[in-house]
Amino acid sequence: MDEYVIDARGIRKSFPAGDAAPEEALRGIDMTAPAGQLTALIGPDGAGKTTFLRILCGLMKPTAGTVSVLGTDVTKTPQQVQERLSYMPQKFGLYEDLTVRENMDLYADLHGIPREARPARYEKLLHMTGLSPFTERLAGKLSGGMKQKLGLACTLVRTPDLLILDEPTVGVDPLSRKELWEILLAMKQEEHLSVLVTTPYMDEAALCDRVYLLNHGRFLFRGTPEQLRETAQGFCYGTKPPENVPTRMVQSRLLTDPAVIDAVPSGGMVRFITRVPDGALPGLSELRLSPQPMESRLEDGFMMLLKEDAEKEKGDVPLYGTDKVDISSFDDPSSHDTVITVRHLVKKFGDFTAVDDTNFTVHRGEIFGLLGPNGAGKTTTFKMLCGLLPATGGELSVAGVDLRTARTQARAHIGYVAQKFSLYSAMTVFENLRFFGGIYGLSGKRLRERIAEVMEEFDLTEKQHEPAGTLPGGFKQRLSMAAALIHQPKILFLDEPTSGIDPIARRRFWQQITALAAAGTTIIITTHFMEEAEYCDRMMIQDQGRLLILGRPSDIRKEMGRPDADMNEIFISIVEKGRSSPSSGA
């Protein structure tokens, strides 16, 4: 058993569910994690990943099964195990009113690290995380990426025998994700650190030695990243849409075909998975598109197993609906009216300039992406566009209304979905919709009609009497969308709408967004999933308050000299180039 830092056998965990049968979160799973390796635990939202991590850390007892961590039965002597492992939960407990160094001191005190051992350890961690220049900065003043790095540094103030991380990069931009993983890989190499990490990012799982795929409390896969990738080999294809047709339109059409396991925009193409020989789908020939074989990726194996499991449970029912998008009727939004105009926009907080002389326009029916690293100024820009924050200078109009003088009037034309889905947990789905409809001025027959319409549109009718707080993540997202659209706004603002949502729910979400845009709704979106930049008609990338680049994804790739690269690579290149230029002040 000593060769494994984790040896779990037959783990079950059930939670009471009132008068109903107990809810089974884990259904008899086995896991072994060898010492000195990086092990990834992946799976959709609600799969049971966090429950399993808490059991391994001795924070929760299993209903059944045995758990040996670092050679010790964690169910009998949890404290003995906890003295040798470090755990970084999703919401790590930084003290925002303490400085970077004070947070590290606090965790060093908690772990009993001798004072004479701290300087060398601190120096190494601060250097690796890039936090050396910020030791006296309050944690609350750090960007999201820097907070995650500080959380990791605090977790590693002692040298643990096992490091357990629960989605350490959710809500973190691609550049910060890359830096965090460089730290993990370096620590594994230098200190022979054993790591178990959960992640929604398949490119991160690909960096690990072993991968476990959990769904509905059961493991669908155990093995190496390469073995998971190979499960989809020979079933992956790509097709390139005509110049004037967005990849999202072709993707949405493909997803309605029961023979398509998955489809996603990537590098200006649409990648898809199908068991149909040579990828020769009738829908492609109708669109005069040709498939070409492609190498599988780890995400392809992930989606293939997840889709097959879902269809076993739900039967032969298309997961993405059957409503076909009419690609022939696509109307390029660049020819439509301008609904958002931004000229020389500036926002200052005291002496700090969060947004500096930014200019852009957005057209009716356009999907426009606001992208950037944590702390880039995109959230500030987003809030000014929504009328939630006044600008310091410049011109800003939304739906023909000047936001400098009539913010309340402009908000009547806007729908807004916040990062954390601003729902009332104790109220039912129906009650939430009635409440938000009332806020937007709907009443009587019109309110009842709109509630019925959005419940049908977002498949919420069967859930209408359930409290919002008990809904799975994907349903909460749908309810937030329904609430934001109940008054039929001209413009929909989406702030990190797919964070923490499983891949199948993400695909459904983008089908709905594609349909909304085709019907004339303008979409403004922020996201850290760079694949989602491919859905945008145009996008802008900000950093340090400055606009670095603006244009169509395909044009931006060409401008960077990499027409076939994925947007993750392009994003990192643009930000690194911007920070190295003399005008960046870096």
Predicted regions and their residues:
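Helix-to-loop junction immediately C-terminal to a conserved catalytic motif
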Residues: C57, C386
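Conserved ABC transporter NBD signature motif
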Residues: G65-D73, Q80-V81, G394-D402, Q409-A410
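Conserved ABC ATPase "signature" region
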Residues: D105, D109, E116-F134, R434, ...
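Conserved ABC ATPase signature
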Residues: L138-L142, P467-L471
